[in-house]
Amino acid sequence: MTRIKRGYIARRRRTKLRLFASSFRGAHSRLTRTMTQQRIRALVSAHRDRGKRKRDFRRLWITRINAVIHEMGVFYSYNEFIHNLYTKQLLLNRKILAQIALLNRSCLYTISTEIKN
């Protein structure tokens, strides 16, 4: 029976893995078995946090809008403000409202007084 040499396939796979794990700390960037485990863990975390990022930003936008509304003293709650937006059929999402709240508070004040009436 002739000898079969493994070739470069396994080396190429480990090199690719090593490039992925090169920024990891300690044995996680040196040992092949822990590299594979950390790679799986990193990809799982990345997948989970892509969804979490959306929730976090929405939470941040709501907090900013609520803070500016209370600061202006419109006698509003955030809940009423959003409800009035929907009843008046204004197509402003929370991201846009948060940007307006940061950059142009007087504009948000006029929007809130207009939809309240």
From Swiss-Prot:
Belongs to the bacterial ribosomal protein bL20 family. The keyword RNA-binding applies. Keywords: Chloroplast, Plastid, Ribonucleoprotein, Ribosomal protein, RNA-binding, rRNA-binding. The keyword Cell inner membrane does not apply. This is Large ribosomal subunit protein bL20c. Binds directly to 23S ribosomal RNA and is necessary for the in vitro assembly process of the 50S ribosomal subunit. It is not involved in the protein synthesizing functions of that subunit. GO terms for molecular function: rRNA binding; structural constituent of ribosome.
